[in-house]
Amino acid sequence: MSPGLAELALAIAEAVPDLKILLTSGEAFGPFASMEAAVAAEPAEAPGDETEGAYMFYSSGTTGQPKGILRPLTGQPFNTPLRIEAMMAARFQFDDTSIYYSPAPLYHAAPLAWSIGTQMLGGTVIVTDGFDAEATLAHIERYRVTNAQFVPTHFVRMLQLPKAVRAKYDLSSLRLVVHAAAPCSIDVKEMMLDWLGPVIYEYYGFSEGGGFTIVGPEEWVARKGTVGRSITGPIHVVDDAGKELPRGEVGHVMFETQERFEYHKDPGKTAEFFGPRGWSRPGDRGWMDEHGYLFLADRSSSMIISGGVNIYPQEAEAVLTLHPAIRDVAVIGVPDKEFGEAVKAVVELMPGTVADDTLAGELIDYRFVPAEVPVYWNKP
């Protein structure tokens, strides 16, 4: 724990008394011992029976509290590359020359895993203490970043910069920009490709593992909106009863997998995740085309049913995100006596923007088809 987070560290130590090893990267304080001193006290020789461990990440908690993901140990020799490192090297061209930029919080599984993986492969990691759009461009230029990982919100914030600001920075060192974790609208992806060129890759996966798709820039341009094809095993799209659906129909996305894990101290959730067939069910809805490319509709838990019509919030969010008055947006379903559910958009406006009925009307009219028009508005 960094000394700069001393107050938070002490609160965590008090709240979780079962923590046995408490280390700080600076001078010792409270119950936290110096990491340097602890390392210096260890034998210089490696233990004779040391084997490789496994990451234990936590789920994102979209349907409740984050859950620990406990993987079986392989017993392989220490420093044997784990699957994430092998995949980064084979699929995303990471090696000992990579300079990886990670602006997202390390309590998320992907930024932490990819940062560790880069170092295991001999590369360099640049971690920031927050995201700022222009600072990101300055960092890429300063550190000659080769690989970076973003979420679509980062893309939007960078695209909102004036073109003159974006043009100030030399981004030519970028070999690969990867994004995941949330839906990226077609318009945003097209603008990023126009700006940075064919270096943008997308993947779809989940903290639990058991399913992973990848799509490169050329593939995506040919099938706009896809998150790619599986590299781990067959994908199935099924209805609520578990029946396989034809290509092109929206249903629950499931992956055939031999990979196993346990939710920490939660066998019931573990059984629910794999279901009776033993397939991974990440909780997303989507469809596949005739070539096996997966397209996502939304989280199953996010779908809004209004007057018998299925409405996917991410479609409305993708449109509203591009409006120049909006900084961020979330679209949700709210109870409605007539339709069962109505659509509600909660928007964060750009600084200096006036929230009034004129703007609300403008946003409702902004590139929507009737079934997607949000009917309630909250304006902070």
Placement of each model-derived feature along the sequence:
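Conserved AMP-binding/adenylation subdomain of ANL enzymes
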Residues: 77-99, 103, 107-147, 161
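Conserved adenylate-forming
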Residues: 42-52, 56-101, 123, 168
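Gly/Ser/Thr-rich phosphate-binding loop
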Residues: 36-37, 55-57, 61, 120-121, ...
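Beta-strand->loop->alpha-helix junctions that form or flank phosphate-binding loops
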Residues: 23-29, 201-208, 227-228, 332-335
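Adenylate-forming
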Residues: 67-70, 79-90, 100, 137-139, ...
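AMP-binding/adenylate-forming catalytic core of the ANL superfamily
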Residues: 1-3, 138-140, 148, 241-244, ...
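Short beta-strand->loop structural element characteristic of the AMP-binding/adenylate-forming
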Residues: 1-7, 67-70, 124-130, 201
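ANL superfamily adenylate-forming
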Residues: 10-57, 76-85, 161-164
